[in-house]
Amino acid sequence: KTFRLARDNGAKKYFCVSTDKAANPVNMMGASKRIMEMFLMRESETMPISMARFANVAFSDGSLLHGFNQRFAKRQPFSAPNDVRRYFVTPQESGELCLMSGLLGENREIFFPKLSEHLHLITFSDIAERYLRQMGYEPFRCASEEEARDRAAELIAKKQWPCYFFSSDTTGEKDFEEFFTDKEDLDMSRFDGVGAIKNQPIYDSQKLDDFSSGVQALREKGSWDKQAILDLFFDLLPEFAHKETGKYLDQRM
């Protein structure tokens, strides 16, 4: 809808933010962004479009580090999975990537940061421990959430911070993040710190129309559940690897 408003009001180019989670999506947020990319491939036949996929923006509202800030201010234990790895970018880096894609991206290109798996991919538990040491506290690993809560006041008084790290069993969490798939055509030579996915206008117009009709039918019905939305996603993205466990990382964090 925003693309059509831009086009109909004389815009020369359209830019849109995607996410690293759109590459081989395993959760609904990543899948919805991948679907957005698919719709924009069709719209790119009428006006140039570029996009950016980037990682978690450090300290942005709702991010892991924002949550750590809130827990630290409230003197609460830290809880995080020890087997999920994530990339992080600063607000400035994310803004620069968006500007580069908007100004320099060719039609249908998706820009992403060149981040090293060995240098920049880090587990949530490692981030928590580095954060606490930066704040002047030594992380103290507890065996359970209950122990972390019960010993919080005692440990914090001794400049130790209670932490509970666990193996992830939550819905829609990848073990690690990726910015592209092995099926996408990449340009890794144009910029030092940025790569580009070069897309062709390949799409199934009938499937896109069916998805739009399905969403509209749910809206007209006035009620829906998660499974109804998932069914629409699976019809358009048969490779969508969503696994529902009934548990969510936000609840554990």
Enumerate the language-model features and the residues they cover.
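Conserved Rossmann-fold NAD(P)-dependent oxidoreductase catalytic core, especially the SDR/UDP-sugar
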Residues: 1-34, 42
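Strand-loop microenvironment adjacent to phosphate/nucleotide-handling motifs in alpha/beta enzyme folds
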Residues: 38-253
